[in-house]
Amino acid sequence: MAAWPFTKAHLQALAVLKLVSGQPVPWIVGRAVADPISTEDIQFPSDAGVVRARLYLPENKPNAPTLIVLHGVHHLGIDEPRLTAFAAAMASCGLRVLTPELPGIKDYHVDRSSVQVIGESARWFAQKTGGPVGVMGLSFSGGLALIAAADPIFHPDFKFVLAVGSQDAMDHVANYYLTGRELRPDGTTELLPAHEYGALVLEYEHLEDFVPAADIAAIRPVLRQHLYEDKSAETAAEIVLNDTQRREARELIDVNSPATLRKLASVQTKHIEEMEGLSPHGRLQTLTTPVYLLHGEADNIIPAAETLWMAHELPGTTLQAMLVSPVLAHLDLQSAQPGAWDEWRLVHFLALVMHAAGRN
């Protein structure tokens, strides 16, 4: 039955989407994700240092195909519930899944150290399992995975890259936080008010550019707890601030204040070369690793125009599939009931990835 692998991939894709959104999985569909799995917390050495990671393994398939799933900018790292649910669902489809922790991104720093960890993780998993591995990166991790795949050192270890809600050019994303707009490749403009989260991550990463050096140690915990969305801890951290520090912290948290916007613009100018080093833009025209691009139409942290720019730059032989979907926001499924066609397009896109991941 030549059509069965594609049919199975579509059933698995539908089941995975149901599982991660907390919806019941129909019995006939659930059989496609019925492999019992085990998890194992591990560490492995790399040139980037010891990497903490978790393996999700289908118990009855010791030689199953492989997939790395990279977490986004979140303090829970590989323990973030959406990530663990997705990794477990993919493993139940018969994939060996590795989720390496990216210490920089876990601490709200998008930097070159994470590119190194991503490349080293792909190399370690490829050597352990005997062949190149698929790599799925969420949010900024997806863009960094593309940079790692373009590195000649790590390129042979990448089977494909799936970038979900990821950046093409960091300076464009930083400018979006200032303006709520971004130009698309076709000349139209994406207009969507930016979520505060993206600007807050920039502030946290470059706090020395926003407050005096003497105030950094006191203000950073306030900003950190605000990013964690822990209001009680944020209030507790504010107690130790003096009046000047309290005013500085509140100004930072108000990402639309004129003073904060001026500082954000200054940071974009000051760190432009660093941002270029964290951007797939300029590296994609010669990339030969197969690429899948997925973005939420309503993404207000990294705008969907970023995926359109990546698709515009990638060679046609490299770009396997691209979808900007109204079913997704940033990394979450939208709460509103999607249309049947939009839901099917997302299922089909994920099925293409499942089929690629399942090929040894």
Q: What would you call each of these model-derived segments?
A:
Residues I78-F86, T99-G134, A149-P152:
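Catalytic nucleophile-loop/oxyanion-hole region of alpha/beta-hydrolase
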Residues V135-L138, L162-V164, L294:
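Short beta-strand immediately N-terminal to the catalytic nucleophile in serine-hydrolase-like folds
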Residues I147-L241:
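Alpha/beta-hydrolase-fold enzymes
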Residues N175, A237-E276, H281, L308-H312, ...:
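C-terminal catalytic histidine-bearing segment of alpha/beta-hydrolase fold enzymes
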Residues L287, L293-H295, D299:
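Short beta-strand/loop motif that positions the catalytic acidic residue
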